[in-house]
From Swiss-Prot:
Converts cobyric acid to cobinamide by the addition of aminopropanol on the F carboxylic group. It is a multi-pass membrane protein. GO terms for molecular function: ABC-type vitamin B12 transporter activity; threonine-phosphate decarboxylase activity. Belongs to the CobD/CbiB family. GO terms for biological process: cobalamin biosynthetic process. The gene is cobD. Pathway: Cofactor biosynthesis; adenosylcobalamin biosynthesis. This is Probable cobalamin biosynthesis protein CobD. The chain crosses the membrane at residues 1-21, 50-70, 89-109, 165-185, 294-314. Keywords: Cell membrane, Cobalamin biosynthesis, Membrane, Transmembrane, Transmembrane helix. The keyword Cell membrane applies.
Length: 316
């Protein structure tokens, strides 16, 4: 029953929750709960690769089992009350809430717009907000470098917070485990964002989460290329050329794809000082380029959602 009824409806309701309500309170946000678990386990474990492996197994299995249990309990509650329809509705609501927690359409757009606007008005204030999007030190960034950081993060997060969770949701929905798969991905992504750094205290313990994140984002990152090309058809060849030339210049095997695609569409240079430069023949990003990037990624988000919905209908 769940497998037959839910996948398409869950996606639509999850999207509506995201657009209308945005992010849930931190105390009730599954990703925040996952992050709390990661932090507590990190404090308990020695800084070794085996610790990262143990944390990965515990957090992923915990997220999957919790999602599985909550959905089935919701469905069973209605059945025990003598109403299968009530069970369907409860499971639909719980499933949609859990799925919504794995992506962030509205939050990503609004945060990028807020910081982009603030760069022009008060660069120092914008630097204080930039860590919400990027991990680099914003202290010495120029206006152009700050805009580049926003555009880079927006395009990279398009994969991590939109394409990847939708990809795994659709992929596993045929088995009735779409929400659980999206939660598993988000668990890996959260571990990577907390542990996947090359600092002395995290290099070993973060190794497994970082590699898992690379593996799970490999296909979605490359899918971002055709999606962004369709979102900007007049620049499709520029996007393709930029990706073919610059996708491998970033330390991550995946982030270069959406960032190079965005750079090709906008014609702007993107650079993390001392680490990489994408489209070095391009111009420095200007104020309107942040708005253009938000519009571009917004269209690509809609395409990803529409494609996911269409696939769920076809696979039903």
């Amino acid at each position: 029953m769940i497998t037959e009824i839910f996948p398409f409806s869950v996606l639509i309701l999850a999207l509506l929750i995201d657009i209308v309500l945005g992010e849930p309170p931190a105390a009730l946000h599954p990703v925040v709960i996952i992050g709390t678990a990661v932090d507590r386990l990190r404090r308990m474990m020695p800084r070794r690769k085996i610790s990262g492996m143990i944390i990965s197994v515990l957090v992923i299995s915990g997220a999957v089992l919790a999602g599985f249990a909550l959905i089935r309990i919701a469905y069973a509650t209605g059945s025990l009350a003598g109403s299968s329809e009530m069970g369907d509705i409860l499971a639909l609501i719980i499933s949609s809430y859990l799925l919504k927690s794995t992506f962030a359409f509205k939050s990503l757009i609004m945060t990028s717009r807020e910081i982009g606007n603030l760069i022009d008005e008060d660069l120092d204030a914008a630097k204080h907000l930039l860590p919400a999007l990027v991990s680099r030190n914003p202290l010495n960034l120029t206006h152009a470098q700050a805009r580049s950081a926003v555009i880079e993060s927006l395009s990279e997060n398009y994969v991590d917070t939109i394409v990847s969770p939708l990809f795994y949701y659709v992929l596993f929905s045929c088995a009735g485990l779409g929400v659980e798969a999206a939660l598993a991905f988000k668990a890996v992504s959260t571990m990577d964002s907390m542990l996947g750094y090359k600092s002395d205290d995290l290099r070993e313990i973060g190794y497994v989460p970082a590699r898992l994140d690379d593996i799970l984002n490999w296909i979605p990152a490359r899918l971002s290329l055709p999606l962004i090309m369709i979102a900007s058809p007049r620049k499709s060849m520029d996007i393709l050329k930029a990706c073919m030339r610059y996708h491998s210049v970033t330390p991550s095997p995946n982030s270069g794809w959406p960032m190079a695609a965005a750079a090709g569409a906008l014609g702007t240079r993107m650079a993390k000082p001392g680490v990489y430069t994408i489209l070095d023949e391009g111009r420095d990003p200007e104020s309107e380029d942040v708005s253009s990037a938000i519009s571009l990624i917004g269209r690509a988000m809609v395409l990803a959602a529409l494609l996911s919905a269409l696939l769920l209908i076809l696979l039903r």
